């Protein structure tokens, strides 16, 4: 009987709800180990439901935020303490295809740019014309390729007067008889975020056309739950343009873009889209002296949009947007005297300042490089969400 006890140990079954509760308290590295033990646990850990609950539970005042920096050589580096730095090659985006005996087409003018981040997933593009964009999880190294559709522009336009006079754009109707290949365009801007009502993820594609008298844009939404691409608006923004040096920022169910005054090229307002209603709205910038786009830094802090002038003054002020439907207002949440802080002390609170603190010394000394850092670096919270699991 003693031998039977040793040779036939009892099997212990852990209920799913108890296992999930345990997993919520484990670090990412431990979760990765549990994934290889059970397909059921893999599905649980990679699910958006699990990640949503885990993000809520870890909604601490100092979240475990990391930065992903894409170098010119198509290598991704995690900006952390140097002793713990992690570097991996995004082979999917590698420019050197010699191992596969493929020739590189110099005419493609390959580039890599960060387009946005939400729930630990990062959206990238690798061509100037957006022919391919990728959704990656820097933590698990998984990725999914997305292929935006061409947008066709009408030859004749008819203008509709907006119902609300305070809208600085005109929504357009379109009359189309025929198309020519020259009017087929790929998107010029994109953003990635989550519909917080339906808990589904969406990519917003912006197609711009700037003419002498009018500046128009069309918007498409790519729903990752079903792969559907649909038009959500055709607008004339008239007196302003999108800021090319700023990428979109996701926060609390909306995507935000900075716009500039067309003639002066100075900061104008924020253009936002609610990812549930898929409607655009304008948001005034906070009352500060910021005028130039290169000075403005935007990021997501605890699901609220934050904004700061990172170059103009030694007194760095951080503004946070409160979205209390139907009103939105800015609140000053930090004021930091930069000239009395040594840059090597900023790493402890870099998450407060977004990209500006991660590259603080570089940005202060080389202002012409700000847009380069901004378009190749993004913050994210590590999760185990699998990009391929977003498609049903």
Swiss-Prot record:
Q: Which Pfam families match?
A: F-box, FBA_1
Q: Which residues form the F-box domain?
A: 8-55
Q: Would you tell me the protein name for this molecule?
A: Putative F-box protein At1g71320
Q: Which NCBIfam families match?
A: F_box_assoc_1 (TIGR01640)
InterPro entries per UniProt: F-box-assoc_dom_typ1, F-box-assoc_interact_dom, F-box-like_dom_sf, F-box_dom, SCF_F-box_component
The protein's organism comes out as Arabidopsis thaliana (Mouse-ear cress)
Which domain of life does the protein's organism represent?
Eukaryota
């Amino acid at each position: 009987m003693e031998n039977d006890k040793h040779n036939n140990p009892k099997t212990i079954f852990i209920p799913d709800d108890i296992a999930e509760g345990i997993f919520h308290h484990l670090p990412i590295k431990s979760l990765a180990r549990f994934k290889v033990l059970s397909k059921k646990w893999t599905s649980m850990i990679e699910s958006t439901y699990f990640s949503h609950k885990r993000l809520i539970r870890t909604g601490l005042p100092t979240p475990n935020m990391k930065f992903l920096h894409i170098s010119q050589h198509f290598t991704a580096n995690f900006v952390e303490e140097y002793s713990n730095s992690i570097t991996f090659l995004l082979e999917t985006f590698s420019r050197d295809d010699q191992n596969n005996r493929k020739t590189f087409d110099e005419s493609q003018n390959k580039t890599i740019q960060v387009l946005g981040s939400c729930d630990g997933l990062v959206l990238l593009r690798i061509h100037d014309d957006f022919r391919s964009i990728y959704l990656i999880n820097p933590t698990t190294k998984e990725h999914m390729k997305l292929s935006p559709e061409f947008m066709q522009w009408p030859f004749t336009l008819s203008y509709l007067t907006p119902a609300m006079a305070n809208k600085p754009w005109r929504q357009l109707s379109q009359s189309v008889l025929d198309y020519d290949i020259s009017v087929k365009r790929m998107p010029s801007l994109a953003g990635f975020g989550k519909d917080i009502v339906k808990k589904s993820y969406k990519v917003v594609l912006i197609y711009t056309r700037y003419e002498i008298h009018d500046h128009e844009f069309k918007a498409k939404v790519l729903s990752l739950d079903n792969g559907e691409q649909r038009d959500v608006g055709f607008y004339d923004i008239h007196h302003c343009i999108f800021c090319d040096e700023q990428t979109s920022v996701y926060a609390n169910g909306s995507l935000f873009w900075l716009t500039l005054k067309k003639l002066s090229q100075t900061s104008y307002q924020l253009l936002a889209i609610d990812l549930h209603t898929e409607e655009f709205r304008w948001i005034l910038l906070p009352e500060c002296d910021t005028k130039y786009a290169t000075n403005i830094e935007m990021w997501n802090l605890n699901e609220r949009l934050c904004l700061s002038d990172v170059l103009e003054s030694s007194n760095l002020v951080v503004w946070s947007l409160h979205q209390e439907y139907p009103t939105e207002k800015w609140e000053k949440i930090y004021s930091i005297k930069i000239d009395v802080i040594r840059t090597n002390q900023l790493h402890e609170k870099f998450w407060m300042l977004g990209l500006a603190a991660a590259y603080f010394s570089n940005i202060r000394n080389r202002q012409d490089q700000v847009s380069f850092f901004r378009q190749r670096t993004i913050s994210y919270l590590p999760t185990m969400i699998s990009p391929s699991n977003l498609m049903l």
